[in-house]
Amino acid sequence: MFKKFILLSFLLLLSTVLKAQETIPFRLTKHNNIIVKTLVNQKDSLHLMFQIAMEECSVSPERTRKTDHIVFKNEISDGNTVKIGTKEYKNIRFFDNEFTGHESDGKIGTGIFKDQYFKIDYDNSQFVVYNQKPDLKDYEEIDLLFENGQFFVGADNIIKDKQQEAYFLLQSGYSGGLLYSDQFAEDHHLNENLKIIGEKKVTNSSGKVLYTKQGILPFFKIGNFVLKDVTAAFFTGEIKNQKTNYIAADVMRRFNWIFDADRRKVYIRKACILMLLTIK
């Protein structure tokens, strides 16, 4: 009987080890950005911001750490290695002169997780990378649209007691809650229908004016989870550049996320920091 118990314990431990292939620690900044410590080409120690909306890596013109061993040609560098902890990733592409978030020298994308399940675990400040389907108990499945290396999910916006569905790009580099496209903002009259708590005016070199508005969305529903009083930004004015809706870092951090290897599904569970209403 004792031998059977030992064997069962060993098999359970082995199963856990096989499923959780590796963990990557990160630090969450006060701006809600994820920072990963890396060693590039075995020489350059860089703090890179995780950007879920890209696959490759980049360095910023405002970086504070040296990148002497990343060789660029026409602002592109191929064949680099990136070491995180004890794991080294090879053949990584870097772009030069791309701006990044606070406290970082550049960005790191999802390419290091290619063809694998991966989890953004905000509760424990780590990524978990799996070599097979992990335990998804207590997670809710959501359809995922994956295009050009970017992740999109559908969600509902409650505006003036009306439910408006839209697709959102997951954008961990933008520190706010939501950012709406110009089209969505115009179609649903956000300037009139949201409570506005802030405004910033910008004038470009041609004299055209752009206003950045900060509003409050009463309810935002993703899957069966409802967030209340979510900060939501949008633009008004003569400049029309915002083509996509964003679910940004302040909303992303309220959940733990597991992405499947095929990038067709994402599984979410509320994080410990989240105060929300769950629809039964």
Regions found by a protein language model. Give the residues of each.
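Bacterial Sec-dependent N-terminal signal peptides
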Residues: 1-25
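Pepsin/retropepsin-fold aspartyl endopeptidases
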Residues: 20-280
